[in-house]
A protein has these predicted regions:
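Alpha-helical structural signal in soluble globular domains
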Residues: 16-19, 109, 134, 138-142
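Active-site beta-loop-alpha junctions of metal-dependent nucleic acid enzymes
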Residues: 73, 92-115
Length: 224
């Protein structure tokens, strides 16, 4: 509006968006608390914020995020992305955030990709699920090299933060998921689709209710 010569305060715009247009901001639910576990083994940061990969399946990043059903129940998603092209190679959701969820996600990714023994580095934070005996031993058994962010440094795993923000802003925060099956299907299948298919096409096909009455508007290529 400024380019058209109009000047309004943020308060005025907010008032008319609410009263005249019926538009409301989407507020993210409060992040659920988790209990820290005792680490079995902590690894150094081998990536050091170098998120460039020369080829697929060279550097992967992984993390957990929380998602909500309409009734307020929380579910946890574990995802892995390939830094070569930022594609999602695995996404698994469950009721509990555990080392088993992390293992199942990595196992799913490895089964879907052709990985040369000892060629893959998996970067994560220092959450107990990734430092647990079960997970570290699983990584060793499949010849995956672990790398970890320094505690408290979210920028060390920035690609995962960016992916989860996009997932929530363009998908899960816009729709009311009545059942966990609806949530699991969208969160686990949508990221695996070709990039030419937008979220709106897939969500509309499932006839999911839109939150707050608002509408939401493959070849692997390297990301520079």
């Amino acid at each position: 509006m400024g380019r058209e010569g109009y000047s309004y305060s943020a308060t005025t715009i907010h008032k008319y968006m609410n009263t005249e247009m019926g538009l409301h901001s989407i507020v993210r639910p409060k992040k659920p608390g988790t209990k820290p576990g005792k680490p079995h083994k902590i690894f150094g940061n081998k990536l050091r914020q170098d998120f460039h990969a020369d080829k697929p399946n060279q550097k992967w990043c992984t993390d957990f995020t929380y998602l909500f059903l309409k009734n307020g129940e929380v579910r946890y998603n574990c995802a892995i992305i390939d830094l070569y092209d930022r594609s999602v190679v695995a996404s698994v959701t469950d009721r509990y955030i555990t080392s088993d969820l992390a293992i199942r996600t990595l196992q799913k990714a490895l089964e879907a990709q052709r990985i040369s023994k000892g060629s893959l580095t998996l970067h994560s934070d220092q959450e107990s699920q990734y430092t647990s005996k079960a997970f570290t031993e699983f990584c060793e058994s499949v010849y995956v090299t672990q790398s970890m962010s320094k505690a408290g440094y979210t920028y060390d795993n920035a690609p995962m933060e960016r992916y989860f923000n996009t997932l929530k802003n363009e998908c899960t925060n816009l729709y009311d998921f009545q059942t966990e099956q609806e949530l699991y299907r969208i969160v686990e299948e949508l990221p695996m689709l070709p990039t030419t298919m937008c979220a709106r096409t897939v969500i509309t096909a499932t006839a999911l209710p839109i939150r707050h009455g608002q509408e939401h508007e493959g070849r692997r290529e390297q990301v520079s």
